Amino acid sequence: RYVRAMVVLVTGFVAVSMAGLTLAIAGVAGPLQVGVVGLALWAALLVLWGRAPVSGPARPDPRTWVLVAGLLVIAVSGAANVRPQGLYVLTNRDPGIYVAGGRWMAEHGNLVVDGGVEAVPGLDSLDGLVAAGAGQTETDGDPNRIQIQGAHLFPTVLAVGEWVAGDVGFGAAPAVVGALALAAFFWLALKLLPDWAALAATVALAVDFAWIYTVRGYLSGPTLLLVGFAAAALLLDAVASWPTRPTRLAVAGFVAATALTARVDAGVVILTVPVLVAVLVRRQGAGARTGRALGWWCLGAAGPAAVAAVDLSLRSPRYLSDLGSEA
């Protein structure tokens, strides 16, 4: 049941986030539009994954007390991290652009900020006050078309949080993502370790200061961890079900490539995943059809990769140009 719940939660998070980002790039994002498209994409991912149990070598089911304890750790960690309501984010430099972008998207449904809109009415009338924004640049020299720096998945998550629960949802979004990331870590650990060791590792991560700070104040980091842990767990199950259910590899590829819409440098890791897919499939022996398996994974990854490319080239070209010059 925990595995099925995680498949549902992860695919739901990815589906709604990708729907919101795609519609925001087009300038038509809103709670109704994102809800309809997100639910349709979510349903498609669940159908592609299917309800059949994972085949392949069986692992013993985790004991009930381990699952209960793990869920309790995740719940307590999430509750503790949600209490600050994003105050770490509001006082930290880099995530500030996520906050500004998320607010704009929630209220206007697009990723092009109108430079003529004052954040605080009457601000320009105050003598001696100069305002400047970091992480925002003009588009083609037009001060009324301002780019929001970077990839835009997390501003989308913040916007969805506001649509769902107003300011409370907006401020709670980092902690919710962090709780899902911790749950995905527990899910992956249960596949690789004895259940007691998976629980111990989850507890150690939940109380680690670096983890707590990352969840409360870094934003893109927990999103990558959520996608990464979940994609790895899905990949293990998809390979175990190969070639009976090839569409599971497509779902694993879709989730993994979503990382590209959160951070550009995630591409360095994503490029190595096809190698991992080939190695895992080849271990099944003769007749494993490695090339076909890679094709299914890449087919799933193509959609989010295309959205990430369009997002950067159309809605953050200055940032993309700066990355190119640094490279």
Segments predicted by a language model, with ranges:
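Membrane-embedded, hydrophobic transmembrane alpha-helices
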Residues: 1-64, 299-327
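Transmembrane-helix signature of polytopic, membrane-embedded enzymes
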Residues: 4, 168, 185-207, 226, ...
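Membrane-interface alpha helices of multi-pass inner-membrane proteins
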Residues: 24, 188, 201-202, 248-264, ...
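Transmembrane-helix motifs of polytopic, lipid-linked glycan transferases
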Residues: 43-50, 169-193, 230
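Hydrophobic alpha-helical membrane-interfacial segments at the cytosolic entry of transmembrane helices
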Residues: 67-73, 251-256, 270-274, 285-313, ...
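Interfacial juxtamembrane loops and adjacent helix segments
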Residues: 103-162
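Short acidic/glycine- and proline-prone juxtamembrane loop motifs at membrane-interface regions
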Residues: 174, 210-224
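Membrane-interface transmembrane helices that cradle and orient dolichyl/undecaprenyl
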Residues: 231-249, 278-285
